């Protein structure tokens, strides 16, 4: 696998592949990789002739008092895992490469509406940072296909909306959430959990599953939401949000809606965990 922190190196290699008529898939990450990321890379390898990955802990998407400085950097292990999974080119830019004028003078991309609810309400500016860095990476790599995890459901919709609105010729593919045996969604932030917290953490998925089951049986949104929040609190979580939304727009779900998604974010110890369930009724 070729690794470079320089934009020109990435463009040169991709141009060489393009000159031979070959296709390119892209998997952007922040590093500290787990099996969920590796699944994205393997899926990417099945879609295109070549796979490009990136590792960049993006300061623009972290708010004040968030874990930018503490976010684990594990480049050597990540590189080994990416190579084994089929990545051929790894882009590892520094903040200076991506934001040479600094964050305050950086042009940014903002996807209105869908960016301002749920995680966007709890983390102001987060999705502006996500959309900006992903747009920049797309312009550098210019892939045919880009893959993202369904665990970050709102992020996936933000990116799909950006690609559609800006007429970018890229297919965005969401890949199913990879879970531990307990049902806990794999996340780089699971490393913040103590043993006791990790044992309690599967309650997040259990609460979401119970909500969906009740809704399918005709229970009210309000009743199932309150029950699920109570279960989370009993398990040691502090809920940030737990909501039922329209699966395509993230607008508040209405009783007549069929395509639904339950989205949750909750704190346990030092970790903020998110999860979701997309379903039809």
Swiss-Prot record:
> Which residues are (R)-pantoate-binding?
61, 155
**Reaction catalyzed:** (R)-pantoate + beta-alanine + ATP = (R)-pantothenate + AMP + diphosphate + H(+)
Q: Main subcellular localization, coarse class?
A: cytoplasm
What Pfam families does this protein map onto? Pantoate_ligase
Its annotated pathway reads: Cofactor biosynthesis; (R)-pantothenate biosynthesis; (R)-pantothenate from (R)-pantoate and beta-alanine: step 1/1
Listed under GO cellular component are: cytosol
Enzyme class, top EC level, equals: ligase
* UniProt subcellular location: Cytoplasm
What SUPFAM superfamilies does the annotation carry?
Nucleotidylyl transferase (SSF52374)
Which parts of the sequence bind beta-alanine? 61
Keyword set for this entry?
ATP-binding, Cytoplasm, Ligase, Nucleotide-binding, Pantothenate biosynthesis
GO process terms (BP): pantothenate biosynthetic process
Quaternary structure annotation from Swiss-Prot or TrEMBL: Homodimer.
Q: Which family would the database say this protein is a member of?
A: Belongs to the pantothenate synthetase family.
The record, for HAMAP family, names: PanC
Q: What does this protein do?
A: Catalyzes the condensation of pantoate with beta-alanine in an ATP-dependent reaction via a pantoyl-adenylate intermediate.
Q: What else is known?
A: The reaction proceeds by a bi uni uni bi ping pong mechanism.
- Listed name of the protein: Pantothenate synthetase
Native organism: Shewanella baltica (strain OS185)
Q: In the UniProt record, what gene is named as encoding this protein?
A: panC
């Amino acid at each position: 696998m070729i690794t470079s922190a320089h934009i020109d190196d990435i463009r040169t290699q991709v141009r060489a592949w393009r000159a031979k008529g070959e296709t390119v898939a892209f998997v952007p990450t922040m590093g500290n990789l787990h099996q969920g990321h590796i699944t994205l890379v393997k899926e990417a390898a099945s879609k295109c002739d070549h796979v490009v990955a990136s590792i960049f802990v993006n300061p623009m998407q972290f708010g004040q008092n968030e874990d930018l400085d503490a976010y684990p950097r594990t480049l050597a292990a990540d590189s080994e895992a990416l190579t084994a999974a089929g990545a051929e080119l790894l882009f590892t830019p520094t903040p200076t490469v991506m934001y040479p004028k600094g964050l305050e003078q950086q042009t940014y991309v903002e996807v209105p509406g869908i960016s301002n609810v749920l995680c966007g309400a709890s983390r102001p500016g987060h999705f502006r940072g996500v959309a900006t860095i992903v747009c920049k990476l797309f312009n550098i790599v210019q892939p045919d296909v880009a893959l993202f995890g369904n665990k970050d459901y709102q992020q996936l919709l933000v990116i799909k909306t950006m690609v559609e609105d800006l007429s970018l010729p890229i297919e965005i593919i969401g890949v199913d959430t990879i879970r531990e045996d307990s049902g806990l969604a794999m996340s780089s932030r699971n490393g913040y959990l103590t043993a006791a917290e990790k044992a309690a953490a599967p309650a997040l998925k259990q609460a979401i599953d119970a909500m969906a089951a009740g809704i399918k049986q005709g229970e009210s949104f309000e009743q199932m939401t309150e029950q699920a929040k109570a279960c989370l609190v009993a398990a040691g979580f502090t809920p940030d949000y737990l909501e039922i939304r329209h699966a395509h727009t993230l607008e508040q779900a209405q009783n007549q809606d069929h395509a639904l998604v339950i989205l949750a974010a909750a704190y346990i110890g030092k970790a903020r965990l998110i999860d979701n369930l997309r379903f039809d009724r």
